[in-house]
């Protein structure tokens, strides 16, 4: 009998073991769809980004008008741009839900998978930041100025580092060209990291909603989960296309319709919605270096979650106290996001400070304490 090419060919074998014959827990819910959704988001962003790059000019005098030209004169240029801009929002929605699922169901105990995932998040954040600068509107310019300036808080080497990043003494043409180069490069790095992420995941196999071993009950990935993923793609593309076609500027800042002007500062400098929680934490500390450290810690704290797991159970499915704490954390993040979009004045300052304190307290103190407490309760 002729060997099955899918199982014998060196390249097809890898695809087969990852997407076709992969043994998958039979009870994984729709929360496990977000990994594949992130993959399709990345593909969409690379495709639309490539098409946009063919019409973009990375020069301070031409960048803004080249984006306007793409929207006005290029066939479906407006649609490509709207899909790319809103696709970034959906990318972040998916990654935040993906992280939330990992946190809730204890998937972070696959340490290598979790750590590469956090590195992926950081790379995605960097990509989105440099990408936001490219249209060279007011918020692009001032966002780049404010965020890159944060590096000057690093003692001794800070100022040199910032000027090195800028390629001069302010955000200017060299900054824009290097940001374009980085924005082109980083998505391919994300794709490479995603493969590493998957390699680590397939070492141990997926977790499941019960947080228990599922070796006794696994089913092939195809056709069950391949079809489930395709359904997920359809469900995600519907709101994405609706947003891109009906209200493409809903999530953007109107300030970015004004070309960059170093002489006029916008009244409220704020990043896109998906960075607002971190921006609120940054602003809640009156000291520059302290704010930068808190900003970095707000994401880097994810590296510590596997070490802070004190419960005997993996998932939160049967841990009501941890569940309560988890949803408090989610609410807290929503409050931080809202505060980040508000001006720096009373009562937003104190709300932001309390929410920032709560964020770190829940993650670093309350979760391990409640985990240990639930262990005690199990013994009674």
UniProtKB/Swiss-Prot annotation:
Manner of cofactor binding, per the entry note: Binds 2 heme b groups non-covalently.
Cellular component annotations (GO), alphabetically ordered: mitochondrial inner membrane; respiratory chain complex III
- Binding-site residues for heme b b566, renumbered to this chain: 98, 197
Coarse class of the protein's main subcellular location:
mitochondrion
Q: Which of UniProt's keywords are assigned here?
A: Electron transport, Heme, Iron, Membrane, Metal-binding, Mitochondrion, Mitochondrion inner membrane, Respiratory chain, Transmembrane, Transmembrane helix, Transport, Ubiquinone
Residues annotated for a ubiquinone binding in this entry: 202
Annotated heme b b562 binding lies at 84, 183
Membrane-spanning intervals of the chain: 34-54, 78-99, 114-134, 179-199, 227-247, 289-309, 321-341, 348-368
Q: Which cofactor does it need?
A: heme b
| Cellular localization per UniProt | Mitochondrion inner membrane
**How does it sit in the bilayer?**
Multi-pass membrane protein
GO molecular function ontology, one term from the record:
metal ion binding
Q: Which GO terms describe its biological process?
A: mitochondrial electron transport, ubiquinol to cytochrome c
Q: Name one Pfam family in it.
A: Cytochrome_B
Q: What else is known?
A: Heme 1 (or BL or b562) is low-potential and absorbs at about 562 nm, and heme 2 (or BH or b566) is high-potential and absorbs at about 566 nm.
Q: What binding partners and quaternary form does the record give?
A: The cytochrome bc1 complex contains 11 subunits: 3 respiratory subunits (MT-CYB, CYC1 and UQCRFS1), 2 core proteins (UQCRC1 and UQCRC2) and 6 low-molecular weight proteins (UQCRH/QCR6, UQCRB/QCR7, UQCRQ/QCR8, UQCR10/QCR9, UQCR11/QCR10 and a cleavage product of UQCRFS1). This cytochrome bc1 complex then forms a dimer.
Annotated family: Belongs to the cytochrome b family.
The free-text function statement in the UniProt record for this protein reads: Component of the ubiquinol-cytochrome c reductase complex (complex III or cytochrome b-c1 complex) that is part of the mitochondrial respiratory chain. The b-c1 complex mediates electron transfer from ubiquinol to cytochrome c. Contributes to the generation of a proton gradient across the mitochondrial membrane that is then used for ATP synthesis.
Tell me the protein's name.
Cytochrome b
Q: Which lineage ranks, top first, belong to the organism behind this chain? A: Eukaryota, Metazoa, Chordata, Craniata, Vertebrata
Q: Which gene encodes it?
A: MT-CYB
